[in-house]
Amino acid sequence: MDVGSKEVLMESPPDYTAVPGGRLLIPCCPVNIKRLLIVVVVVVLVVVVIVGALLMGLHMSQKHTEMVLEMSITGPEAQQRLALSERVGTTATFSIGSTGTVVYDYQRLLIAYKPAPGTCCYIMKMAPQNIPSLEALTRKLQNFQAKPQVPSSKLGQEQGHDAGSAFSGDLAFLGRTVSTLCGEVPLYYT
């Protein structure tokens, strides 16, 4: 071993001091790449925070919508569900909570109401200029059901049937939607 190599080992160790100025030094990277890397990391963090906030808002909105829908379905107030038939604009069907179903037939100018127990069906004529709203119709039908009177005329009486018999004729003149709703129960014209 020669003496020169021992001197190298005997030198004092290098100083390990803090980075001057508090800067982050990434070895073997030029300054412009370091700046670009810092900008990219900041932009990615901002995007992640924004996307997270949007997803939380969407989740809260979805939960609120589901809660409102569930309350409207199971709630005591009237549920008004509109279902149009194959011929758009000719019939509209409304389910009025647990009290019954109303069908507006705009082609035949008829309104059919079947109470929830399904013991009878009421048919009304409507004027094309004065179509009653669902609220007005519901009030009228609830008042009509509250009275213990006999319905004004049974739909078989006009053809010579007595008041106690059920009308067993062809219901095609009522249309498919009203016939489906009222086909198996006595019909009353109000």
Swiss-Prot record:
GO cellular component, one term: alveolar lamellar body
Protein function: Pulmonary surfactant associated proteins promote alveolar stability by lowering the surface tension at the air-liquid interface in the peripheral air spaces.
Protein name: Surfactant protein C
Lineage top rank: taxon: Eukaryota
GO biological process, alphabetically ordered: respiratory gaseous exchange by respiratory system
UniProt cross-references to SMART domains, sorted A to Z: BRICHOS, SF_P
Subcellular location: Secreted, Extracellular space, Surface film
Keyword line: Disulfide bond, Gaseous exchange, Lipoprotein, Palmitate, Secreted, Surface film
Residue ranges of every copy of the BRICHOS domain listed in the record: 94-190
Matching InterPro entries: BRICHOS_dom, SP-C, SP-C_palmitoylation_site, Surfactant_protein_propep
Keyword Secreted: yes
Disulfide bonds: 121-182
Miscellaneous note of the record: Pulmonary surfactant consists of 90% lipid and 10% protein. There are 4 surfactant-associated proteins: 2 collagenous, carbohydrate-binding glycoproteins (SP-A and SP-D) and 2 small hydrophobic proteins (SP-B and SP-C).
Propeptide: 1-24, 59-190
Lipidation positions, renumbered (S-palmitoyl cysteine): 28-29
Signal peptide residue numbers: none
Species, as recorded: Bos taurus
PROSITE patterns found in the cross-reference section: BRICHOS, SURFACT_PALMITOYL
